[in-house]
Amino acid sequence: ERSIGMENHQPILFLRLEGPLQSWGERARWNHRDTAYMPTKSGVIGLIACAMGLGRGDGRILELDRAVRIAVRADRPGLLMTDYHTVIGIIRTADGKQRGRKGQESTILSYRQYLQDAIFLVAITGEGNIIERIRKALMDPVWPIYLGRKSCVPSRPVLLEVSNEYASLEDAMNRYPRCERSEESIVYEIEAEQNGYVRRDIVTAAPGRLYGERRVELKPAKGE
């Protein structure tokens, strides 16, 4: 963890999300488990909630989501991988009835997508003392941290530093040192007021895994 800078800007917390596999579900349904091309806000909030020891349904997760803004930069986008799972046996439907013909086995093919060998830089800013609370939780997490799914373990500590050297999230995305040297152009995703496109990755109080919408823009990182 690097030291805090001396400039008088709002503190920004930086994460490095790196591992053999990551999966940030955005439109997962039943036997199809997709991954977004970058970490979702709900996924990042879930990672922080694990560090804080907040269980699913805890109202403080919703408060956490509302208190922070994030931006994500793809320093190494990774390769998309699809893992196929076959389940054979007596399979029950949601209402407890046997799927298929009585006494006969059924087969379900499921699809799970992952990003291989990706590296993402996440910048987080927030209200009050929320950044310091997140930093302390990530320094000594209550529960294990994972990259979207519990099977996706980070290959290094995710916390980089808290810095006040950057004027904004956009400034941080453009100037923060890249996690990996590359001649290829890199992009970042940042929240937008009106332009851009919609992502459904805002934590809500609705029952089940229902998410709200936010607008984001995809921009090329300038670098230094």
Regions found by a protein language model. Name each.
Residues 1-5:
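Short, Lys/Arg-enriched N-terminal segments with co-localized hydrophobic residues
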Residues 6-29:
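N-terminal, Lys/Arg- and Ser/Thr-rich interaction peptides
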Residues 7-9, 64-66, 114-116:
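Solvent-exposed loop and beta-edge segments used for protein-protein assembly and interaction
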Residues 12, 67-69, 117-121:
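Extracellular structured ligand-interaction cores
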Residues 15-22, 42, 103-108:
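Membrane-targeting and insertion segments and their boundary/processing signals
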Residues 15-16, 49-53, 99-104:
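A short linear-motif detector with a strong N-terminal bias
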Residues 26-95:
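Glycine/small-residue-rich interface belts in oligomeric ring/scaffold proteins
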Residues 73-224:
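Internal, well-folded beta-alpha domain core
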